[in-house]
Amino acid sequence: MEITFLPLILLGAAVLLLAIFFYYVPFLLWISAKVSGVNISLIQLFLMRIRKVPPYIITRAMIEAHKAGIKTLTRDELEAHYLAGGHVEKVVHALVSASKANIDLPFQMATAIDLAGRDVFEAVQMSVNPKVIDTPPVTAVAKDGIQLIAKARVTVRANIKQLVGGAGEETILARVGEGIVSSIGSSESHKTVLENPDSISKLVLRKGLDAGTAFEILSIDIADIDIGKNIGAFLQMDQAQADKNIAQAKAEERRAMAVALEQEMKAKAQEARAKVIEAEAEVPKAMADAFRTGNLGVMDYYKMKNIEADTSMREAIAKPTGAPSKPLKD
């Protein structure tokens, strides 16, 4: 008995052709669209496959928009947004949420926000339900030198019209932190801040920190304030240590100058003593010349020796016991 594979081959070919047909012509998806009231033809679904646009995404988005009462949304707009690299599902979700919340969100604005890299659906949700952002600990010093560490909670609402080109959460946090530092730094005492923490939030809110951002600040609440270090005392200690080092350096400089002056005076004294000794050495020569010339007699010489002896005796009496006496000159 011969076994023929022709029926199996034909069956396989038929299954393959049907698979290809239903891939390029999603008949079940077309039926789903018709049942939902969306006007779309099989040819349009086929052309989507040719243009490499997933018919399922476009059709499901049109069904969702139609059921939500958004009648102005067209297939060409959704296809164009998909081909531009946008997220069709998120855009339609955002349009539906905005419509239910009575938020004015045109399709062009929604697609622009999506193509700008922002989550348009999350933005609509933030417009309906404001988001609370916790700031990191902000450290500031009051005028009395006490350090304070504050934490704040910022309640923001998305500003849909500023989502394209507006600053993000990082800018909000940076501005709030700057405002907290400025408010604490302008306080005369840290006790004032601890007694009235709401003064910080009021001052920060008055500055309009949400200008140019994609958010609208609804409230700023100080969640916690801790006392840090006494920065003023540390600065005073550092200044005192610096003054001490400067004073020690100046004292050392004066001591060195005094030592140098003392050594200089000793050198001058030695020089003067040497001159005296040199002058004393000339006395015998002068006396000899005086004897030769007759200007000095023998009696004058002995009278001078007596005067020297009396002077030496008086010096010996005036000196304390044990001090060496000056020897008499011959």
Swiss-Prot record:
Pfam families: FloA
Entry membrane topology: Multi-pass membrane protein
Domain of life assignment: Bacteria
GO terms for cellular component: membrane raft; plasma membrane
Entry's transmembrane regions: 5-25, 27-47
Location (main, coarse): membrane
Subcellular location: Cell membrane; Membrane raft
Keywords: Cell membrane, Membrane, Transmembrane, Transmembrane helix
HAMAP family per the UniProt record, alphabetical: FloA
Protein's job: Found in functional membrane microdomains (FMM) that may be equivalent to eukaryotic membrane rafts. FMMs are highly dynamic and increase in number as cells age. Flotillins are thought to be important factors in membrane fluidity.
Entry similarity comment: Belongs to the flotillin-like FloA family.
Subunit structure: Homooligomerizes.
Name of this protein: Flotillin-like protein FloA
